[in-house]
Amino acid sequence: LDEANETVIVTLSNPGNATLGSDDTHTYTITDNDDAPVVDFNITSSNGAESTSSKALTVDLSAASSQNVTVDYAVTGTATGSGTDYTLANGTLTINAGNTSGTITIASIVNDSLDEANETVIVTLSNPGNATLGSDDAHTYTITDNDNAPVAVSYTHLTLPTT
């Protein structure tokens, strides 16, 4: 279990038939030798229709830690954030001590009526705290357009003979 170093302090007191010297305390540090867990996405891509209201992306640890694990994330892609296509800003995910996963949620996916290409939301992990970054550090979520293409109407001009 990855954990912080631990200390044991031994203090001598109340000697019998002796006198304590100035060195009556000893501190021993137990150095943690376990590797920090690896943090990354459990899958690197997924998709859903515009009618999906939100999508939770799972971030996993390779092992539980006795310390909180943090990881920053940045949001890019072809979809527009700030409520236009979805809501999710750059941020930091905290996975509490003892847990092995956390979620980053793409919220308020907008079911618009525009016929458009599929759009992507790319979430990239960086700067882990109390963990090391794994190779699956980016997740691409594709918002699949569910709108029909507009109907094409064409007109033909007819000239009729007069009688």
Spans of features found by a protein language model:
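Extracellular beta-sheet repeat scaffolds used for adhesion and glycan interaction
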Residues: T70-V110, S126
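Terminal edge beta-strands and adjacent linker/stalk segments
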Residues: P15-A36, S126-A149
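Short glycine/proline/serine/threonine-rich loop/turn segments at secondary-structure transition edges
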Residues: L1-V8, V110-V121
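Short, solvent-exposed loop/linker segments at the N-terminal edge
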Residues: S46-S53, L158
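Core beta-strand segments of extracellular beta-sandwich domains
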Residues: I30, I43, S54-L61, I104-S108, ...
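Proline-enriched interdomain boundary motifs that mark the N-terminal boundary
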Residues: P37-I43, P150-S154
